[in-house]
Every structure is written in structure tokens, then in C-alpha cells.
């Protein structure tokens, strides 16, 4: 509280105060702080993540999912944090026995915008492998990895193996060039 009073223009301290309120069973106060922070800066990743935590704790599943999507589509948020959010979504999805549709839709939305690195695409491909999806489904993801990281040997090798399994030697040659 002292830091948020001392630095009233710093959203970080206010959001941290909101997190503290949420942890100490004061959800109404936490919600008001998160709402104010997001009204001031709708792209504030810390406030978005805190709001998602609020919705989850309050059992507001549909709002929780929407807030997760907002976090994942936030261009100010680094790929490592987005990957961590996706890992959590995947874990929850696996634990509840849901199908992979929502997870794949989230990956698709994330990969439809330019990526700073191959972290999200690599996680997506790993998920597809875990789900034993058909090779053809993973090809665009492998190509996305190579688009961002042309020297990614693992992605290039996987793409090459797909081409060889399909006896598409012209494609195999193209991949090796």
C-alpha cells in the first residue's frame, strides 16, 4: 500500500497491491484496482494477468478464458510469458480431459501475427506431436519456425522427415537448400 501511495502514477505498484488484496481475500478491492489499471492502460500485461487470476479465483470461467486470450494476443508481452500461459492452458486442458480444439485455436491466433522468435511455434509443434497429430497439420507450424529462425535445425529436420515420409523428394531438396 505504501508504494502505491508513494508512486500513484506507477501502475505496477497498484497492480501489486491488487494482487495482494486478491491473495488476502479482498477480491472487490482487487477488482477495482485491476479495472482502473486496465482503463488507464488496456495493454498492461501485468494488469491483464492479474485480472485473469481474479476471474479464475472467482470462478468466472468465460471471462477467465477471454482474459487469457487478451494476454496471449498482447503485443507488449514477451514470448516466454505467453509460452508459460499456454503451458498452463495445455495442462488445464489435459487435466480436465477436454479436446485440443481450444488450445489449437489459441495457437492459430497467436501464430497469425508476427512472432519475435520461434518459442510459440515450437511449443505448438511440440503440442501437436504430443497429441500425435498428422504430419501434414504440423508442416505450416514448422515452416513458421523456419520463417522466424531459418537456422533451426530441429524444425528443418522435422520438415525434411515429413517430406521423405511422403516420398516428396523435390520438397526434400527444397528444404535442404
Model-derived segments and spans:
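Alpha-solenoid helical repeat scaffolds
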Residues: 1-177
